[in-house]
């Protein structure tokens, strides 16, 4: 039974792999037997992720996916892969009236356009094996709920959700699946470096029926499931994992 969840023999590209969810996804994919290709902008942190992976044959490609050129160079350097997990992203909280076009460009280039361009280039350059799996890391802020100052961030994640559904239809003839993982708040370095104090964080956790935030490795487990052959009949789906938050 457990073999159906194995990633042995699969090559998986993980973006945003230098920390947080991306690092955890790479670690769990490697633990499940995958050969991982890690990409992000920070080489030192990528090497730290690489050193933490089980198994051999993993590699690193430093790339800035917020630019067209960075995406093209990355895809040109890739072998054919069996899966892509798009984890690259930033979180910024800012009221809409205080934003300008540079804020729009930064968030959309990093959170949405990087993933969209990556999949476009991978398809155009024929870097996806038949029956590959593409997984987008979205957020409940994109489709399920909003928060003050989250208009741009939510818009970027909503864009990924819409892209996933249409692209799933487009790639279905090649048996390539496209799905999203839609988490609530996850404990990552991004959260640790936020301006929210410990008391506020504890109060916010109590709004979750399971009384805690998610862990990055839990997103990693879910990514492994969606990359595995256990989900060969799942595409265009948004898999919600939010500790029950949106039940409220």
Model region roles, listed by residue range:
Residues 18-19:
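Conserved glycine-rich cofactor-binding loop
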Residues 95-96, 100-108, 200, 204:
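Substrate-binding pocket helix/loop in short-chain dehydrogenase/reductase
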Residues 124, 169-170, 232:
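Alpha-helical segment proximal to the catalytic Tyr-Lys
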Residues 119, 156, 164:
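Active-site helix of classical SDR
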């Amino acid at each position: 039974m457990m073999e159906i969840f194995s990633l042995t023999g699969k090559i998986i590209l993980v973006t945003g792999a230098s920390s947080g969810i991306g690092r955890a996804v790479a670690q769990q994919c490697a633990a499940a037997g995958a050969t991982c290709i890690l990409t992000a902008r920070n080489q030192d942190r990528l090497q730290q992720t690489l050193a933490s992976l089980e198994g051999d044959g993993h590699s690193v490609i430093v790339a800035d996916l917020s630019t067209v050129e960075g995406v093209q160079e990355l895809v040109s350097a890739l072998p054919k892969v069996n899966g892509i997990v798009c984890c690259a992203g930033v979180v910024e909280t800012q009221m809409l009236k205080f934003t300008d076009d540079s804020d729009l460009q930064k968030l959309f280039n990093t959170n949405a356009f990087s993933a969209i361009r990556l999949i476009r280039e991978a398809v155009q350059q024929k870097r996806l094996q038949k029956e590959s799996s593409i997984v987008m890391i979205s957020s409940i802020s994109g489709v399920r709920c909003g928060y003050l100052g989250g208009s741009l961030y939510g818009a970027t994640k909503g864009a990924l959700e819409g892209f996933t559904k249409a692209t799933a239809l487009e790639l279905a003839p090649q048996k390539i699946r496209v799905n999203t993982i839609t988490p609530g708040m996850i404990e990552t370095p991004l959260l640790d470096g936020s301006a929210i104090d410990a008391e506020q964080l504890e109060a916010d956790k109590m709004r979750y029926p399971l009384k805690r935030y998610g862990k990055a490795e839990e997103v990693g487990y879910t990514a492994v499931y969606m990359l595995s052959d256990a989900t060969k009949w799942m595409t265009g789906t948004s898999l919600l994992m939010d500790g029950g938050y949106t039940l409220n």
